[in-house]
Amino acid sequence: MTINNQPEPTNEQRRIIYQARRGLKELDFYFEPYIKELYLTAEAAEQESFAQMLTHEDPDLLDYFTNQSRPEDDAMWALVNKIKTWRHSKSLS
C-alpha cells in the first residue's frame, strides 16, 4: 500500500495515470482527484471505462463533462456522471 492507502499501481495503471494528465485545467479538475483517490481502488470495469474515456479527444471530454454531448458508451457516461457528482460534492465540503 502507498502512503494514501492506495494500492501500488500496476504498469498498466501507471500508463493510464500518466494519460490522465491532460493539461486542460477543466479536465484536470476532475481527473487529478479521481486518480489520486478513487481510480486504484475502483472495480476493473470502471478502470476499463476510464481507460476508454482517455482515448477520446480533449474537446470531446470537455463536452461530456459540461453536458454538451455524451459518449455513446453508457458505462462511460455513467462514469462521467459519477466523477462529476463526486468531484462537485468534494468541492462543497
From Swiss-Prot:
SUPFAM superfamilies: YgfY-like. Keywords: Chaperone, Cytoplasm. It is found in: Cytoplasm. The keyword Protein transport does not apply. Its main location: cytoplasm. The keyword Ligase does not apply. GO terms for biological process: succinate metabolic process. It holds the Pfam family Sdh5. One of its GO terms (cellular component) is cytoplasm. InterPro entries: SDH, SDH_sf, SdhE_FAD_assembly_factor. An FAD assembly protein, which accelerates covalent attachment of the cofactor into other proteins. Plays an essential role in the assembly of succinate dehydrogenase (SDH, respiratory complex II), an enzyme complex that is a component of both the tricarboxylic acid cycle and the electron transport chain, and which couples the oxidation of succinate to fumarate with the reduction of ubiquinone (coenzyme Q) to ubiquinol. Required for flavinylation (covalent attachment of FAD) of the flavoprotein subunit SdhA of SDH and other flavinylated proteins as well. Belongs to the SdhE FAD assembly factor family. This is FAD assembly factor SdhE.
